[in-house]
Amino acid sequence: MILDILPRVGLKPKDYFLKFVLPAVLASLFMVVLGFIYFDGITRLLVLALPLLLLGGALGYPYIELDSQKQKINERLHVYITKFGVLSITDLDNKALLELLSVEKEELGQLAEESRKIYVLVKRWNQSLAGSCRFLANRTPSSQFGDFLDRMAYSIDSGQELKEFLAGEQDIVMDEYAGFYERALYSLDNFKEMYVSAITSVSFFVTFAIIAPFLLPYDFVTMVTVAIFIFMIIEVILIYSIKNKLPYDRLWHTGEKPTAIDRKLRKWLIISVGLTILASIVLFWGKYIYEAPQLLKIPYELIFSIAMTPLMLGGYMAQREESLVIRKENNFPDFLRSLGDSVSAKGGGTLESLGYLCTNDFGPLTKDLVALHRRLSIRINGQKSWKYFGHDTCSYLIQLFSEMYERCTYLGGNSGQASHIIGKNFRKILRLRRSKYQNVNQFAGVMYGLSGGMALTLFASYGVASMVNGLYSSLDIPDTMLSMVHVVAPSDFGFISYMMYGTLIIYALCSSYLIKLMDGGHYQVSLLHFSTMVWISSIVAVVTEMVTNSLLKATIPV
């Protein structure tokens, strides 16, 4: 029942009725009256269908919100169990531990709110920790988190210490997270097939829109515009669906202040965008205004591709920094376990052990370790030193887990145990990421292939339509048959060519954004994918124009 779901998503029945149901009902009544008074035919049916969407959205909101909260819990469960386990080996009592988890909203997201609920039950309502866990286990949106709370309640009742329970739960919860992650990757494969099918179908629809005006009394520009509009809607829906299904797994850090690498990438972005703007002005002014003979011979598709080429520079620099960040992540677990074991064995502070480790080679991470040692040796603020270390690596995972380690040792936890927990879970996350990168690379290859396939389909159809239009224009058609033959003005046909190429540019934009959305990397790399897809589309389009012009002897504007 919907009333049973409302408390689980933090809504009171009264608030739900006033904020969602009542406005939807009033808006629906208004649209029904409007539809019957001012519209008729198909337009009336469309207007009368809108109230169904509004009422369906109001009734389905609690279920959508419940699923959203479940997704937010499951995608951060690995961070939660790692931080919970690491902090449990400190000198904090259970209440202080829950209070600390409840304020980590940036790291834990919805799980911080779930921890706050347990803390409120224990602190303000004087409930036992086991009873509070059982109470929340029956109300949390995530069954995985609910099972974890049930197990924790049982272990506490049986007299087991919390840190012992959490040490044993690390593998269990991480395996559950791995299952959740792998299911998301499997759904990504399904979305890949859906994406290919949808783009292929829309391409044929645009092709039909090009040919149909010769057979039916429809305007060319209108048909192609409608087809492109539908194409854009489908692209947005697919991107939104994929974005909601993918787990939160970003690569880049979330620091407030830009690092040296961030400033470097921003500099290259400004340079590449500036060169693109300059090249666009020079090339298009020279072709269409100055009408330079050399540029007039070059198809407009290649002119646009040349103008967009400088964007590859900014994208390539970001991709190179991404690869360095990934290498840093691969070296981080080994460094942290070495540091924790060294500190535990010597029984001393972190500074001496870190100074020794800085002499070893940890790949690209070594430079950041030297900077960390230099900050810690000043002995001003150790917490900020570790925080800046995480930001300087530009890795979200290193930022997250290095701060966990620092917090544990600061609160009196055993550095060796903390480093082993973090290092083990870190490696599991890296293994899952490798699978994701492989899937995303396959998806990117499909998108590159589709960009060429779309260009071939659209411009081959355009060549056929241009040939038919030229044939109709050259015939001496009797006046009685003029209404049966549809001829397009040459200027309109050139405009349709630009619209089709614009469709390919929109596809390149959406696909390049989608690639970086899926792999969680720096969005500046999408410039490299965009420029590459533009070149593929342009070359295929130009070659297709030349072939159709040669085979069909069609006059296709360049």
Curated annotation (Swiss-Prot):
Keyword Membrane: yes
InterPro entries in the cross-refs: ArlJ-like, T2SS_GspF_dom
Subcellular location: Cell membrane; Archaeal flagellum
Keyword terms, alphabetized: Archaeal flagellum, Cell membrane, Membrane, Transmembrane, Transmembrane helix
Domain of life: Archaea
Sequence similarity: To M.jannaschii FlaJ.
NCBIfam families in the cross-refs: PRK06041.1-2
Entry protein name: Flagella accessory protein J
Organism: Methanococcus voltae
